[in-house]
Amino acid sequence: MKPVLLFSLLLWLTLSQALGYDFVVAQDGSGQFRTVQEAFNAVPDFRKKVTTIFVKKGVYKEKLILAGSKNLVRLIGEDRKKTILTYDDYNQKKNIFGEDKGTSGSASCYIYGADFTAENLTFQNSSGPVGQAVAMWVAGDKARFKNCRFLGFQDTLYTYGYGSRQYYEDCYIEGTVDFIFGSSTAWFERCTIFCKTGGFVTAASTPDSTRYGYVFNQCRLTGNAPAGSFYLGRPWRPYAKTVYLRCELGKQIKPEGWDHWDKESNKQTARYAEYQSRGPGAAPKQRVAWARQLSDAEAQQYTLQTVLRGWDPTQE
């Protein structure tokens, strides 16, 4: 390596680490890397300390994969609305063999590594209303997203990981059909859920052996969809579990609230509930008979540490 290049690299490492960042990503070349994937690849496998990556403003069109060996990665954007990680795959888009990519293959970003944190970023699937098109696919355990946006249409956020615990705080999530879906246990704190066109907010596939699925706490459900065009959820698998606590529900929410996905037996196995919903979409007396309104005592059982099995994502 030439002395000048080595000096420049060491200087950048010193400056970025002084700011609390291990790596800086910038499209203009002012960081160590021009792409986020390069920074992901540079994270040492199975490192036992946090690796912090700062991403400068820009639209980064990349299909991202954070490998399972890349743990404790913290990804921070310079500006939530101006630091955009995007790609445009979708379910029926063909791979190099002429086969459909499928829903899982459509994701713009895959997170396999455990203890991942993202802040001040936009994750987008820019393919448009073309069917299933995932913006974020999370399999790793103990994933945290703070002040992030998730943009798409159908199947925007795939909480994929079996046994995975996920936490979303002050995030914006938009979509049409089943745009928050999967088998993971996920807590959504003060998030804005934006309903587009019409459809279903959630499609949990919670396993029978998992006590908690989705918990929305103090969230706001709004959107530009017509009044009465959205269900709070439907069960992708029989034992789906979704609870809304102290949420503001916009006019987009149907009075009946929940759908059983054309399968009568789901009414006996799915666990859907609300507590102190408010707003024009809150209609407890008109909800389907097989969903519940929680008592004060029942609602108190829903705490971060209980739902997330001892993990407190608010602690660094």
Where are these regions (language model features)?
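Sec-dependent N-terminal signal peptides
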Residues: 4-14
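Boundary at the C-terminal end of the N-terminal hydrophobic targeting segment
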Residues: 16-20
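Sequence-level preference for short, compositionally simple segments enriched
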Residues: 21-316
